[in-house]
């Protein structure tokens, strides 16, 4: 039964793009291509190190901007606003938690990776444990995760934004974006990716600030946001249910460990495990730190990215909540027929929160600017995935199949891999059109919680426990994969019920939150890996030199690039500056957590 209290049509056509908006979008794309071509021309593209790691000569500010831009692709840009609209502030924990893990990347994981002189993280695993089976396992797993979660999420979210704001053909707009992104990624390698990421990050932040100011103005400021959100109830609801009501704990970060949608226990422990995989062991992210001129530049880049990661609360999540307050019949819909009219999906439309704000609140010209914010977010994330996936396949799989391959062949294969990824991505579009944006975001998180914890466990043991060996790590990964894959299959067979329906899923799904499952999977993998390592011979000292935290012997003070002008005194000074900023950053982070607790 549906209750209907509506008095007007919530689906009346919204504002359309003007000529000025189109001009702004065109100018942005021209600028983006120009920066890509410029950085490609100045890049050392004819060597493997130059193409895949930017010649190990990147400075801190483009690294930090690229880290932020790569993590805030259009999938998360729209997803964070949508999650804010659906459940409130707690989703900001996915960004704020990154502060500590990014510092761990720079001070711990990055030091190990740079000292081991690796190009890919699978290469590090091969050096640390020996053999090839773990390296191949991680390379294939990373490629699959990139294609079926990262590219999928970004493509769907980007296409959703383009469809709502521009009305362009779904396939045409997606293929055009993929083509432009792949063009500068193929030609320029990591240098082009990092510099265009830096440009796109600047545009993202400026545009998001403007929209956030406009959104807060609509509700008379931050002080009115809680009350406005609490009143965001759609006119048509499902009788005898409460799913149309905004959450009572919407303004709190820490939520009940049993009944909360994002329990504080899971957000503290489970999310940290997943974030460690993403920021410290995922090729897409770590590749930026590996390109640093020296360790200080890697540290400063992580600090800059951490400061930027504090922004999504005010620039994406709160505007998402405001969008629901302003447009409850569309963003907050619960009746399947109403949701289908609003966004083409029956189980909810929270993911249209951000593009709805853009089209309704932004004036002529600025509306085009905001579209030029979302498109670079999509392109930034896709370019990162293309480049890193190309690196993985070329360096870890192709070079294994053809050990005598020349540098020219490796570079050609790397570029061809990007073309193949484009084809797979386009073929995946029909699947994305049949999926709900919210379901896709939850699916991505579930996949991460089911597949990432074993990788985090093995990397953590490999870096901090000298006794860990290949046999223990391999069997730990297999055990974790078996358990994680089982949960994924169950989730696919038993999707979450819609509003008003009984939850008949198995207890492992209905009673065990995916963030809590991540903790259990991490512990299981670690236990198997430790047991297997203790039952087999330990690695010898020379096998783990410069590969664990306790066996570092290489002096990193003069950087990864010879002749970069660093002196020990200058290096020490900037190391102290980085250390001070890291402490300040953690204090700021703790303050915000406490304020919104």
UniProtKB/Swiss-Prot annotation:
Residues with attached carbohydrate = 5
Q: Which organism is it from?
A: Oryctolagus cuniculus
- PANTHER family hit by this protein: SODIUM_MANNOSE COTRANSPORTER SLC5A10, SOLUTE CARRIER FAMILY 5
> Transmembrane stretches, by residue range?
17-37, 74-94, 101-121, 138-158, 172-194, 201-219, 266-286, 302-322, 368-390, 411-431, 445-465, 473-493, 515-535, 577-597
Q: Which gene encodes it?
A: SLC5A10
Keywords, ordered alphabetically: Cell membrane, Glycoprotein, Ion transport, Membrane, Phosphoprotein, Sodium, Sodium transport, Sugar transport, Transmembrane, Transmembrane helix, Transport
- Provide any one GO MF term from the record: fructose:sodium symporter activity
State where the protein is found.
Apical cell membrane
**This protein's name:** Sodium/mannose cotransporter SLC5A10
Keyword Metal-binding present in the record's keywords: the answer is no
Purpose of the protein: Electrogenic Na+-coupled sugar symporter that actively transports D-mannose or D-fructose at the plasma membrane, with a Na+ to sugar coupling ratio of 1:1. Transporter activity is driven by a transmembrane Na+ electrochemical gradient set by the Na+/K+ pump. Exclusively recognizes sugar substrates having a pyranose ring with an axial hydroxyl group on carbon 2. Has likely evolved to enable renal reabsorption of D-mannose, an important constituent of oligosaccharide chains of glycoproteins.
Provide Cytoplasmic-side residue ranges: 38-73, 122-137, 195-200, 287-301, 391-410, 466-472, 536-576
PROSITE patterns per record: NA_SOLUT_SYMP_2, NA_SOLUT_SYMP_3
Phosphoserine (modified residue): where? Answer: 49
